Amino acid sequence: MHCPYCRHPDSRVVDSREAEEGAAIRRRRSCPNCGRRFTTVETAILSVVKRSGVTEPFSREKVIRGVRRACQGREVDDDALNLLAQQVEDAVRAKGSPEVPSHEVGLAILGPLRDLDEVAYLRFASVYRSFTSAEDFEREISEMRAARARAGATAD
């Protein structure tokens, strides 16, 4: 790590701590040349591989934009969308791979979105899963009702 003050090509780590709820590492460094201290924050880069094969950095903002479209006209606030985007990023990072197919990002959105707002979930799922008929919607609604019934039965 180059010193930002004197550009010396080496530095010594004085202290390391987790930051951003474990998503990053904050390191306090010291330059052996000029003696000044500086802080670095290290994060693992997460990339999304699109269907076309193009790779782009994971973007919470892009997740929020897509989900916001599905939530249009619904009572969903920005804090809930930010939390959902964080849950999606956590789920994708938990896969342990630096590159994740865009399909897996979509799958990671579905669960938290279903919990957040069922109508928005249906809108998102209809595009993501390419619904082509009313039967596709009916099948998804039936699955949602069955899951709700199972959850109610286990809560008793």
UniProtKB/Swiss-Prot annotation:
Protein name in the entry: Transcriptional repressor NrdR
Entry keywords, A to Z: ATP-binding, DNA-binding, Metal-binding, Nucleotide-binding, Repressor, Transcription, Transcription regulation, Zinc, Zinc-finger
Cofactor(s) named in the record: Zn(2+)
Chain ranges of zinc fingers (unnamed): 3-34
All residue ranges annotated as the ATP-cone domain in the record: 46-136
Example GO biological process: negative regulation of DNA-templated transcription
Record note on cofactor: Binds 1 zinc ion.
Cross-referenced InterPro entries: ATP-cone_dom, NrdR-like_N, RNR_NrdR-like
Known function: Negatively regulates transcription of bacterial ribonucleotide reductase nrd genes and operons by binding to NrdR-boxes.
Gene Ontology MF annotations: ATP binding; DNA binding; zinc ion binding
Coiled coil: none
Family of the protein in this entry: Belongs to the NrdR family.
Native species: Nocardia farcinica (strain IFM 10152)
HAMAP family: NrdR
Lineage: superkingdom: Bacteria
